[in-house]
């Protein structure tokens, strides 16, 4: 008796274009700034038994857990219900795994990587002092219910105060522009800017924004 085909279905997120921006940003933050030094980057490769190709970015998280973002090429767009490109977001431990949404992936990455406001920043903001830290991953807070303290710190970070030095604000803006610019360029362009000093902290636009994920 001939055995029928067995299919394994997994949820993926459609991506409208190619993945160079995503790969370029990951390589920049891993090899240039060191913000993602612990991240494992597996370049675009062929899967032996499949017709599609993929790449993998594995984020080690707290508590022996990991977040893996797999990007797929060459799916079946002729069917009408699949894009040529898509990504899969998976959180897993040694004994358990589950697929997550882009906003959940942002929160998981922010919990381990990229700085946020420290506990003493509220008191510094009330006293009109310079903020000593800032949130370099605001996209991770987009779908959360923020506290009044966090909202106030975001306003101070974005607008600044006349009586304090706005170095933190300027640095944040530079990192913001740098993060978006790097995400749109091919990784080879970084070699041409080898004389530039690395940023002390990079800004991460967010998984959905970089990949242009279509819900």
From Swiss-Prot:
<keyword id="KW-0946">Virion</keyword>
<dbReference type="GO" id="GO:0044423">
    <property type="term" value="C:virion component"/>
</dbReference>
<dbReference type="GO" id="GO:0020002">
    <property type="term" value="C:host cell plasma membrane"/>
</dbReference>
<keyword id="KW-0597">Phosphoprotein</keyword>
<keyword id="KW-1032">Host cell membrane</keyword>
<keyword id="KW-1043">Host membrane</keyword>
<protein>
    <recommendedName>
        <fullName>Virion infectivity factor</fullName>
    </recommendedName>
</protein>
<keyword id="KW-0833">Ubl conjugation pathway</keyword>
<feature type="modified residue" description="Phosphothreonine; by host MAP4K1">
    <location>
        <position position="98"/>
    </location>
</feature>
<keyword id="KW-0014">AIDS</keyword>
<dbReference type="GO" id="GO:0030430">
    <property type="term" value="C:host cell cytoplasm"/>
</dbReference>
<feature type="short sequence motif" description="HCCH motif">
    <location>
        <begin position="110"/>
        <end position="141"/>
    </location>
</feature>
<keyword id="KW-0945">Host-virus interaction</keyword>
<comment type="function">
    <text>Counteracts the innate antiviral activity of APOBEC3G. Forms a complex with host APOBEC3G thus preventing the entry of this lethally hypermutating enzyme into progeny virions. Functions as an adapter molecule, recruiting APOBEC3G to the ubiquitin-proteasome machinery. Targets APOBEC3G for degradation through the assembly with elongin BC complex, CUL5 and RBX1. Binds viral RNA and affects the stability of viral nucleoprotein core. May play a role in viral morphology.</text>
</comment>
<dbReference type="Pfam" id="PF00559">
    <property type="entry name" value="Vif"/>
</dbReference>
<keyword id="KW-0472">Membrane</keyword>
<feature type="region of interest" description="Multimerization">
    <location>
        <begin position="154"/>
        <end position="167"/>
    </location>
</feature>
<dbReference type="GO" id="GO:0016020">
    <property type="term" value="C:membrane"/>
</dbReference>
<dbReference type="GO" id="GO:0019058">
    <property type="term" value="P:viral life cycle"/>
</dbReference>
<feature type="modified residue" description="Phosphoserine; by host">
    <location>
        <position position="147"/>
    </location>
</feature>
<feature type="short sequence motif" description="BC-box-like motif">
    <location>
        <begin position="147"/>
        <end position="156"/>
    </location>
</feature>
<dbReference type="InterPro" id="IPR000475">
    <property type="entry name" value="Vif"/>
</dbReference>
<keyword id="KW-1035">Host cytoplasm</keyword>
<comment type="similarity">
    <text>Belongs to the primate lentivirus group Vif protein family.</text>
</comment>
<comment type="subunit">
    <text>Homomultimer; in vitro and presumably in vivo. Interacts with viral Pr55Gag precursor and human APOBEC3G. The interaction between Vif and APOBEC3G is species-specific, which may play a role in restricting the replication of HIV to humans. Forms an E3 ligase complex by interacting with human CUL5 and elongin BC complex (ELOB and ELOC).</text>
</comment>
<keyword id="KW-0832">Ubl conjugation</keyword>
């Amino acid at each position: 008796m001939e055995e029928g085909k067995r299919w394994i279905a997994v949820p993926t997120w459609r991506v409208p274009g190619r993945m160079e921006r995503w790969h370029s940003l990951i390589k920049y933050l891993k090899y240039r700034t060191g913000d993602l030094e612990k991240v494992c980057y597996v370049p675009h490769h062929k899967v032996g038994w499949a017709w599609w190709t993929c790449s993998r970015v594995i984020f080690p998280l707290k508590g022996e857990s990991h977040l893996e973002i797999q990007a797929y090429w060459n799916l079946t767009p002729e069917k009408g219900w699949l894009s040529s490109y898509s990504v899969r977001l998976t959180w897993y431990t040694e004994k358990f795994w589950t697929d997550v949404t882009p906003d959940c992936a942002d929160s998981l990455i922010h919990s381990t990587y990229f700085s946020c406001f420290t506990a003493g920043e509220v008191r510094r903001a009330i006293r009109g002092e310079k903020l000593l830290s800032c949130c370099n991953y605001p996209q991770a807070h987009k779908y959360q219910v923020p506290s009044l303290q966090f909202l106030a710190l975001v306003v101070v970070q974005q607008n600044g105060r006349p009586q304090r030095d706005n170095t933190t604000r300027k640095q944040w803006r530079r990192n913001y522009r740098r993060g978006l610019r790097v995400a749109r360029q091919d990784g080879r362009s970084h070699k041409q800017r080898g004389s530039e000093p690395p940023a002390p902290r990079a800004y991460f636009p967010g998984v959905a924004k970089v990949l242009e994920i279509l819900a």
